Amino acid sequence: MSLTQDQKVEIIKQFGTSEKDTGKSEVQVALYTRRISDLTSHLQEHPKDKHSRRGLLMLVAKRKKILNYLKNVDIERYRKVIGELELRK
């Protein structure tokens, strides 16, 4: 359910500039997206797990805030992240 260290490092390498670049908005959005997809698959198997559903909604809200920030600061980086993660059509 949670991300392993290897999975995190792989995502950070893909979206960050270095292996320790975890603060970049693109990296944060990618990590949240991976956690959201994991929680979504968990909730499909366990539909009555209300605590995980709340956690999912909180993660979606955090990702949305970061995406709004990124859209206001640098629209090109925003479009690139949206395209790579296939978040919007």
From Swiss-Prot:
Disulfide bonds: none annotated. Pfam families: Ribosomal_S15. Coiled coil: none annotated. GO terms for biological process: translation. Keywords: Ribonucleoprotein, Ribosomal protein, RNA-binding, rRNA-binding. It comes from the Bacteria. SMART domains: Ribosomal_S15. GO terms for cellular component: cytosolic small ribosomal subunit. PROSITE patterns: RIBOSOMAL_S15. GO terms for molecular function: rRNA binding; structural constituent of ribosome. SUPFAM superfamilies: S15/NS1 RNA-binding domain. One of the primary rRNA binding proteins, it binds directly to 16S rRNA where it helps nucleate assembly of the platform of the 30S subunit by binding and bridging several RNA helices of the 16S rRNA. PANTHER family: RIBOSOMAL PROTEIN S15, BACTERIAL AND ORGANELLAR (PTHR23321), SMALL RIBOSOMAL SUBUNIT PROTEIN US15M (PTHR23321:SF26). Part of the 30S ribosomal subunit. Forms a bridge to the 50S subunit in the 70S ribosome, contacting the 23S rRNA. This is Small ribosomal subunit protein uS15. It comes from Chlorobium chlorochromatii (strain CaD3). The gene is rpsO.
